[in-house]
Structures are given as structure tokens and as C-alpha cells.
Amino acid sequence: MGSTGNAEIQIIPTHSSDEEANLFAMQLASAAVLPMALKAAIELDVLEIMAKSVPPSGYISPAEIAAQLPTTNPEAPVMLDRVLRLLASYSVVTYTLRELPSGKVERLYGLAPVCKFLTKNEDGVSLAPFLLTATDKVLLEPWFYLKDAILEGGIPFNKAYGMNEFDYHGTDHRFNKVFNKGMSSNSTITMKKILEMYNGFEGLTTIVDVGGGTGAVASMIVAKYPSINAINFDLPHVIQDAPAFSGVEHLGGDMFDGVPKGDAIFIKWICHDWSDEHCLKLLKNCYAALPDHGKVIVAEYILPPSPDPSIATKVVIHTDALMLAYNPGGKERTEKEFQALAMASGFRGFKVASCAFNTYVMEFLKTA
């Protein structure tokens, strides 16, 4: 045996940064555990149970949560503790330690600030359905084809399913409902903020929400501006699940063939699904459907020119990667790229009017 002074058996990094780099590499290698653990917690309604069972800044034990689940599994509290411990390490939930009479230390958990958006708000919506959409098996499969798409060309989603994402929705009713719920929930939260920040809907008579899903956004616009008549325009298999809303007409069709006429056309999170060529075709259809004083209101992320490590930038870059995996030419764009699309489509004016939860509201104006 060597002595403790023998340098050959000392485990000391050559540089302190080596330790950090190794840990970062290990974290990246296991990074998939976070969204999948959060997915399980959401599917089990763990966060909703916590929201209903404890006061703000309060705590609850895994055993108390497990008692409210439809399970007889004696290991459920221990398994929940391990899931919640993971979520606590990422500040999704908070924790405190409690010493039991036996001397054992028990972890108790509470809701962290992010849970405001992962549990139902006063409107009954949260971002939980959006997370369930993003982690659905249908949307995980294309990632296994990204390498092939880079080497051979094509779109990972198409390679996985033999068709584009939008056509696939019409073949899978389960996933179509999951997707619509996820998009509707996300839209409702973001749109509520947009309506607080942006006043460009004032004075309109008719607005067309292109790619409006099941009509949640159109209904919110009409609720704030009752004098507006709204047309919710999307593919037929999308609006088949759309509920009736006062002041909203659902129309099925293909936006690349044409769009309904209105004083203004609203397009939220649509351009990033498509290539520049597709966007130009859509925007030219919008231009033709508008009166001389009309405008297209575009709500999208704006891609920063540099990949800085801020959360806001990471969200945009994450979404750009999703577009790379799923959509035909879809991508996030810089402000200059949006302005170029507007000008190339015939619009004379362009401005960034507002921002809500990282979604920028831009106006493409027929007259400058």
C-alpha cells in the first residue's frame, strides 16, 4: 500500500475547472430525467394536490400526497419523495427538513414560484398540458431521427411518421386532443398577458385568428372587445373539437390557399412553424384579405442574435430546436428577419409594439 503522500493515489483534478466540466457533462448526460419526472408529477396531479392541501409557503410530506393518490403501492411515498427531491434540486418545488421522534429526517415539500404556471390559475389553465404535449411519445420519437435528417436531409418528424406533423394530427385523435389542449392552455396564459400589454385590437370590427386552434384566443379578444367579430380559422380536424364561443365563428380551411377577410389578421406562433417560402405565401394571402388600412398582428418569439445563457434566450433557442425536429422549414427569427418577411410580402410598415412572456407582438401594416 502506498502512503497518503503518494501523488499516484491522490484524486485531485489537474485544474479546478476539470471538476466543474465533468459535473456539467454528467448533468447533460442525465438531463432527460427532469422533464420526465415532472411529467409523471403532473400526470399524478402532485402539484395540484399540493396547491389544494397546503397554504402558500406551506409544506406537505410525500406520504400525505400519496394518501390522496389512487394507489395501494406501499412504496409510493418513497418513490414520490425521490421524484420531488429531483424537482427540488431544480427549484420546481421547495423543501424543508423535519426530524421525527425516531431521529430520522423527513423531507417536506412546498410549491416554488414556477408552480404558479404549472398549477391551474383563476381561469382554470396552466402550462402543465403544454409540458405533457412536449413530452408526449409522439413528439419524442422524431428526436431519434435528427442525426439522419442532418446527414441525409429531410425533417425528423417526417422520417419518424412518413408525413408532416400537421397531417399526422388528422390521423391520431388522441394526440390531436393532447396537442390542442396544450396549445390552448399556453395560448390562454400568453394571450391574457398580451391583452394587458397591447392595445392594437381597439377600433377593429372583424379580426381573423389564423391557426387559432380551438378558438381560445379569439374568444379572449372578443371578451375584451365585444364589438369585434372574430373568425377562428384553422384546419378542419382542428376545429372539429372547438367549443362554441359567443362572437366567434369557426371556419375550416388551409391558410396557404387563402384566408378570410377582416380588418386585421392575428397570427400567433404560426410563422415559426414554417419556412420563409411558406411564410411569404401565407403573408401574401393575408395582404390580399386586408383592406387598405389593414394590418397583420404577428405574435412570435424574437431570436436574439447571440446565444447568451439567459433563460429568455434559452426558451427561444429550445423552441427553435423543436421547429427543427418537427416542422417543414420551421425556425425562430430575428427582428430583422421578420421585417424582411413583412416587406417582401408587400407590407409598407413594420413595428414591434409589445412583449408578453417573451412573445413579441409585431404589426405588419399595409400603409406605412
From Swiss-Prot:
GO terms for biological process: methylation. It catalyses: (E)-isoeugenol + S-adenosyl-L-methionine = (E)-isomethyleugenol + S-adenosyl-L-homocysteine + H(+). The active site is at residue 272. Changing residue 140 to M: No effect on substrate preference. It is an enzyme of class 2 (transferase). Gene3D superfamilies: Vaccinia Virus protein VP39 (3.40.50.150), Winged helix-like DNA-binding domain superfamily/Winged helix DNA-binding domain (1.10.10.10). Expressed in petals, style and stamens, but not in stigma, sepals, leaves or stem tissues. InterPro entries: COMT-like, O_MeTrfase_dom, Plant_O-MeTrfase_dimerisation, SAM-dependent_MTases_sf, WH-like_DNA-bd_sf, WH_DNA-bd_sf. Its EC number is 2.1.1.146. Keywords: Methyltransferase, S-adenosyl-L-methionine, Transferase. Residues 1-2 form a propeptide. S-adenosyl-L-methionine binds at residues 187, 211-212, 234, 254-255, 268. One of its GO terms (molecular function) is (iso)eugenol O-methyltransferase activity. Homodimer. Catalyzes the methylation of the para-4-hydroxyl of both eugenol and (iso)eugenol to methyleugenol and isomethyleugenol, respectively. The resulting products are part of a complex mixture of low-molecular-weight volatile compounds emitted by the flowers to attract pollinators. Belongs to the class I-like SAM-binding methyltransferase superfamily. Cation-independent O-methyltransferase family. COMT subfamily. (iso)eugenol O-methyltransferase (IEMT) not only has distinct substrate specificity from Caffeic acid 3-O-methyltransferases (COMT), a highly homologous enzyme, but it also methylates the hydroxyl group at the para position rather than at the meta position as COMT does. This is (Iso)eugenol O-methyltransferase. It comes from Clarkia breweri (Fairy fans). The lineage of its organism: Eukaryota, Viridiplantae, Streptophyta, Embryophyta, Tracheophyta. The gene is IEMT1.
